[in-house]
UniProtKB/Swiss-Prot annotation:
TM annotation in the entry: none
Pfam families with a match to the protein in the record: Thiamine_BP
Protein name: UPF0045 protein ECM15
Name of encoding gene: ECM15
NCBIfam families documented for this protein: MTH1187 family thiamine-binding protein
Organism: Eremothecium gossypii (strain ATCC 10895 / CBS 109.51 / FGSC 9923 / NRRL Y-1056)
Domain of life of the organism encoding this protein: Eukaryota
Family membership noted in the UniProt record: Belongs to the UPF0045 family.
Record-linked InterPro entries: MTH1187/YkoF-like, Thiamine_BP, UPF0045_domain
Amino acid sequence: MSKLHTLVDICMVPLGTSSPSVSDYVTKIEKRIRESHLKSTMHSFGTTIEGPWDEVMSLIGQLHEYSHELGYVRIHTEMRLGTRTDKQQTAQDKVDVVEKKLSDY
């Protein structure tokens, strides 16, 4: 198993539903994410998930399987991910660095 620390920003959307609203779906997916032991931060256009590469990718696969179990035929997922090997950095660390630089401006 890879221990490579990963930050993934993910947005999952079911396609072909009868309603343009996806809040019920997002609620179910977010509940599953929070039930995992991985750190996550929900935001207005998705969720950032942090942890070891294999565990994060496994969770994303589980979320897809769960989505299909819920009866959704097609799921569109967009991901942005990052890794680094020189140090472990959380999503909040990245925000804090920029906020500090802004305050020093």
